[in-house]
Amino acid sequence: MKLVHVNEPRLEFFNGTHVCPRRGISAYGVYDRNSQTRRTNILLGAVGTNKDLEEFSNLLDRMSHPIHGASEDHKSNLFPDFCGFNSKAGFHSELVFNEDLGRKLRQLDIEKVVRIKDRVRRIDEAINLYYEEVKFLAQNRPVDVVVCVLPKAIFDAVSKDASAEGEEKLEESIEVRSEFNFRRALKAKAMHLGKPLQLLRTESLTSGGKGQQDDATKAWNLATALYYKAGATNPWRLEKNGGSSLSCALGIAFYRSRDKKTLNTSLAQVFDELGNGLILRGTLSPFS
């Protein structure tokens, strides 16, 4: 066996290049900083309990300032400081959220979902609970991204099998979990609304939770996702090499029909050199 080290590709930012997306944004700013079409104020809608919406607002306030990464010196390269999400550094944009952009979930409605014994129906009702609020925001508020905050009760309800279902075979259990994946199903149902979704667990909103990533890493992950999902934004791009032609990356999805009788293949996404993606749908093809 021969091992080959492949160098990290260099990424272009506003006024410099770097191999690390986070350090590149901090040092040189997002690639599209001078673009006339990018969002400088990203309007965020949010769906969650009253407490979760307050915690989400507090999180955005903390993210508007720099956040120190892991304290250990030997981990500084892995966990860099967060530059802050504001108009003066890094992303050169602001995340905007207020009470008018929030939709509160009633505890009574959450409890109704949690009490449903059938797992498939429980997930369907949880999807409907969030979908109706997402639809309101998409149709009545000028939001760029909608954040869905999942309290522990909802997360457990959609991610854990009931004890009565624990006797099924492992293969069948995997298929059920895959087919009725809450995250994918909610995003698929809301796709026609034209607003990207970002799902967060309640535990991600608070600082220093047990077993969680450090605060700077969480901020980097959320900030980058929100900036990219806001549309017409490109935090970085691959450095151009004059000696090689541009290429794109293809993602191919395989999935079975609900009756498990047919296998469908779809060209899922095509990305250009800027990272912009097009979603394509393939047609049914015979297979043996």
Question: What is the predicted function of each stretch?
Answer:
Residues 1-288:
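Long, low-complexity, intrinsically disordered terminal regions
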